Amino acid sequence: MILVKANLSLLGGAKKETQFHGSEGKQAAQQKIMVVKPALPWDDHKPRITWRGDGQLFAVSSVCKESGTRKIRVWNRELALQSTSESIEGLEQALSWKPSGALIASSQSKPNKHSVIFFEKNGLVHGEFTLPFTKGQIKVKELLWNSDSTILAIWLEDNEKDESSSGCCVQLWTVGNYHWYLKQSLNFGTDEMKKIECLMWDPENAYRLHVFSTGWHYFCFDWFWGTDHSDGGQGDVAVIDGDKVLVTSFQQAVVPPPMSTYFIQLSCAVNEVTFQLEPKKNSGIAILDSTNILSIYRYGNSTVNDPTVKLGAVSGNGFRTSSQTPKLEKKLRLPRNACDVQLRSFRLLTWVQDDTFLAVSQESNSSISTVHHMNTDQMDGQDINVRDVGTITGHIISLCYSPNTKHCALQTSNGKIWKYLCEYPTPAVEPWIDSMGQEVKFPQPCVQTALASIEGEDMVIGLTERSRLFINNSEVASNITSFHLYEEFLLLTTHSHTCRCVSLRDTSLKALETQLNSASNPNDETIRKVERGSRIITVVPCDTKLILQMPRGNLETIHHRALVLAQIRKWLDRLLFKEAFECMRKLRINLNLLYDHNPKAFLDNVDLFIKQIGSVNYINLFLTEIKEEDVTKTMYPTHALSTMQSSEGAKAKKVDIVCDAVRAAMEKWDPQKFCLSILTSYVRRTIPQLEIALQKVHELRESPSTTIVSADEALKYLLFLVDVNELYDHSLGTYDFDLVVMVAEKSQKDPKEYLPFLNKLKKMETNYQRYTIDKHLKRYKKALSNLSKCGPDYFTEFLSFVKDQSLYTEALELYPHGTVEYKAINAAYGDHLVSKQQYELAGLIYARCNSIEKALDAFIASGNWHQVMCMASQLEYSGEKIAALARTVAGKLVEQRKQADAAVLLEQYAEDYEEAILLLLEGAHWEEALRLIYKYIRLDILETNLKPALLDAQRNHMILFDNQKTTFTRHKERLSVVREMKEKARLGLLDEDVTGCAEADLFSDTSSIMTASDASGKYSQSNSRISSRSSKNRRKAERKKHSLKEGSPLEDLALLEALAETIQMADKLRGDVHNLLKVLILFEYDARAKELQQNFDDLLLLFETSIPEIWPPSVQQNTAAPILGPHSTANSISISYQHQRNVNISMQDSELFTAPKLNKNIQWKLSLLL
């Protein structure tokens, strides 16, 4: 017994009396309710119960005892009545609650139609659709929703009095854009043994339908969503809508179903549609209806209208469409013996060749599938010639064909792939074998398959219901919602709401897998964001449109950048500049690609480019966008470099090349029409040729009757391209005052500003006038040239101008050698160089103008003693004066530690050979000192000076080597300690808190390039103060930057720097030690020489063995790079980010991580001492 709550309050306006009735007013609620007729005669009067998907509510359809009509009541789990439907006349017994919970479906027989109606849970009607039958033709037995609420199955029976002879069928309906589509119609005929007894959807597989018949026959139907589209022509896509096929030509119009470009009207429900797979052209469309009639439509030039093909949303009265429509060629029947094998025997219909179709069938009560070869070259109305070409163990669930390779792939329910060989003398079916000799089998069965060429091999691509994408035996991605193949591209949509466009050309399966699973780069052109739930419908052939469909049914057109660039490159390869330009302009592709794609082809066909583009505005747009950047390497890189740089491009600049080539073509084609574009070509050069452009404007003004563009229009256009002040200055630079006035009149300048200046210029002599203009425009070189032409009276002003602008080299070119002006310029130039402390060059300049005294002083200051003696000779100095000069210069050379040069001066010019010998001994030039000793027979110096100097030098070297060895060893040991501390800190093994420690951020051998923020802040502030100090203080601060103080933040850097300096300093002593050893041996100091050689050899050996320890490979490869990846830790990631912040420090100190090189080419040892 069911207990019901009596007083039920309906919220939300569920009662009709509380509803708004519009213009009828509240009186409408008081109108007398019409009497509703009782339930239909064939109604079994049994109640129907249906539950909502979540089990919280259920609905009951029952016949009222009082009125005899059916009503729907909604109850909750506690048996509390929630609502009662309105009294609906003709309401039938069928009842099904949509699992998603939105609607309750039932059926209604109306006076003029039969409908499926929907109720909300409050009992009010919410929408309906009409069944494609006449009044009283059928009766609705049951309605069933599939588990994901996307398909509504309707069980229908003929409304015959004799039930034993009545037929039955099942229709599958879907909804999109608020329109209901009849997608499939399954006719079970009138055979009593095939009459349906039970119909149900699979609870797990949403697209599997189970049917049981009276004769104990069991049928299982599996469906998958697919898109029927053409591969060429107009980009046609077909949608099944009951007895109509809606066809949209996306090349002509993008309209979402149920709208279409045209539709094909059939006499009964359509079950399958297939296009002839011919790339780049519309060839035909074949339609298989529920009565197994195959209708073949072909595209052609026929002008006869086909009554079955009607225009849709893109046309109407008074409108014409450019879309091509097909014409019915013939209708053929499937043979009855084939149709009677099993219900809807033929499926997966595919049009593979002109008169050839493929289809598959399933044998009753068997797992054997048969592949059928269907020939359709018969006459209209005849049976199709069907031939079995092979059987496969298993249920074939997909079939795909490639018109390029003529291969066909079939997939069974276990994922195994079979190949249909249609090109063999006898068609056959065999397992698909890959290049490794393995059978291809998807890990899971796929609902969509396609054939693609990858690495020169045909591979099968498959997508499962769970978004897993397979290529042959490999899974390449697991988040794919749809895919589409277009030429060499694989387009995919993903669960992350992106659309990828991947080129299959010159790629491998491994690279493709890596690309699909890698994180997207912000600048990656192969990926773009799309709306949530988007699915690919088609790509319009020979265009850039990619059509996506949203979950609610509406369409979106996008132009994926990879597709756009590929199409543009094809147009450019075919020299279709206009198509490429218009696409680039519309989709905002950089116009530099027109040239950069193939510079040689562009320059060779620039006349064709001008002819195709034709528009002055378009050519101006192209010229203004040209820049030096090669966009094929920066913005739009390709794997295969298609560009071929011209030989001219290697020398000249790209902008100049393009401007000159385009201008030459325009002047050849029609200079009057392209006048403004020619001006643009002058302005857009690397160095704008504004004077020539202005001269062109002036020519237009001189001959206005012969031009299309007036001078005023041209000048206005130039003012649009160039700043008015800049244009005024360039017009002034032409020295044409008429042109200057013309530009000034078009500007906003006040005549009081420029007229007095122009009047003053007109009164000047021509050269001086031009000098004044160039000086005003700061064109100093031209001004200097014009001033030099004014004559000797203006030379004083000329020289003053040279000094002011430092134009000495330019001035020297304007006067011949030997003239007074030439010498005066040289003298002034020499004075200028002396002020810049360029003494040697100043001396040369003075010497050229015979200012020998000044040249002598300059050479003395520069230390060039050879030229000093030359100048002294020219001045005819006396012997005493030359000796004094030699002593002065020698003293300066000694200060510069050039004792050998000073010794030459003292010996040859001052004749003080003894002082020369002492200087040579001081500079350790032992052999040269010996030469002078024996030359001047001063053997006493051997005992008094040479031998003591030798012993002192040996002793000093010994002390130096010991000090270097001690210092080097100490620094090396300290570096090991510092590195060990920082390695422990990196591994987190130190007990104390390392956050505030100075070494806390130094976590590896080379981590000293990542300085702590405290230290970096300290040194950055220090550097800002250092910038204003003297060079001496800057060098001092630089030395203090890396402190050797223990515990300093950069101690390891300081140690590396000190060790490298020690090695380099000692390595440079090889030659000095070699020379000292020779002289020690000469004077029989063998023991001291051997000791020196051994100590130096030990020091170098220490350096050589220590370098790999101090600079291991990990240090030289900069292991402080970001530590990321699966083995990274929180500390390492933090360090990586800190490394990026301190990249400048790493650049400055990177040389410290390179080991110093020892010069082993110098043979410094003496074999006598070994």
UniProtKB/Swiss-Prot annotation:
Region (Mediates dimerization): 722-1170
Basic residues bias spans: 1031-1043
Region spans: Disordered: 1014-1045
Main localization, broad class: cytoplasm
Single GO molecular function: tRNA binding
Keywords, alphabetical: Cytoplasm, Nucleus, tRNA processing
GO CC terms: cytoplasm; cytosol; elongator holoenzyme complex; nucleus
Subcellular location: Cytoplasm; Nucleus
Top-level taxon in the UniProt lineage: Eukaryota
Pathway named in the protein's UniProt entry: tRNA modification; 5-methoxycarbonylmethyl-2-thiouridine-tRNA biosynthesis
Chain positions covered by the region annotation Required for binding to tRNA: 1028-1046
Compositionally biased region (Low complexity): 1018-1030
GO biological process terms held by the UniProt record: tRNA wobble base 5-methoxycarbonylmethyl-2-thiouridinylation
Self-association and partners: Homodimer. Component of the elongator complex.
Family: Belongs to the ELP1/IKA1 family.
Biological role: Component of the elongator complex which is required for multiple tRNA modifications, including mcm5U (5-methoxycarbonylmethyl uridine), mcm5s2U (5-methoxycarbonylmethyl-2-thiouridine), and ncm5U (5-carbamoylmethyl uridine). The elongator complex catalyzes formation of carboxymethyluridine in the wobble base at position 34 in tRNAs. ELP1 binds to tRNA, mediating interaction of the elongator complex with tRNA.
Designated name of the protein: Putative elongator complex protein 1
Species this protein is from: Xenopus laevis
